[in-house]
Amino acid sequence: MAEHYEALESKIGAPYYAKKAEKLISCAEYLSFKRDPETGKLKLYQAHFCKVRLCPMCAWRRSLKIAYHNKLIVEEANRQYGCGWIFLTLTVRNVKGERLKPQISEMMEGFRKLFQYKKVKTSVLGFFRALEITKNHEEDTYHPHFHVLIPVRKNYFGKNYIKQAEWTSLWKKAMKLDYTPIVDIRRVKGKAKIDAELIENDVREAMMEQKAVLEISKYPVKDTDVVRGNKVTEDNLNTVLYLDDALAARRLIGYRGILKEIHKELNLGDAEDGDLVKIRKKMTRLQMVHLRLWLIGILHIKNYIIK
């Protein structure tokens, strides 16, 4: 990944890219471990991470942190509120690279409007929102979309239930679209895990039926999933250029409602820009949440771009 930023600096002449290349090269050069006295296993104790959005190492660490945070938040929400859960995927059509940044901005505003509608606002208790971007290399287009985990009131599944057609209509309205977008909504029952890949495949099939293109992201994602092959090519440079620009200074995840309150109560810190060394407060075996989706961060260990 570093060589692509170096190539962008040579091509465009912006020192900004050279600085990112330097950060990537020095990322996690030194790792210090301590042995857990309880388990005897080694645990990362000290390290310097570059925190560049497209860095696969930082994305992996960020993924673990977000996954663990969400595990704690979901468990606490269940304990305090005994709420139900739904999983929502909101999509739009693919866009060319130069439209990616403004499209994401429009989606952020559309998402804000969606959760201000009375029908939605009175039915949900909050949300965890994650932005994902996949790329279709054959069409040279990008597909930004949202995955949303939503705690709902117990009576939501009765008279307050919002059907998929209504979610679709509301998202279309919020985004002011002149076409009908693909929206996937499903209930999370009991302790059943959310299989993000299965959901992605369902969405892909639905979009293919409408002759739209969605390339599905997979586990795990490496820097080679952002760029094709090991060589610096014009296509790879454009991919890094557009992704870096679209994601710069942008929050990829967001909490609202009771999930935001619980995040604050648990004093979990910032998973996107905070410490990437200390993932857990206790040196116990990491209980990876079944909600595999929450491995976020562009390129989170599941996401974002796939060749």
From Swiss-Prot:
Any one Gene Ontology BP term: DNA replication
A GO MF label: DNA binding
Lineage top rank: taxon: Bacteria
Binding site for DNA: 219
Keywords: DNA replication, Plasmid
Tagged with keyword Hydrolase: no
Family according to the record: Belongs to the Gram-positive plasmids replication protein type 1 family.
Protein name: Protein rep
Gene: repA
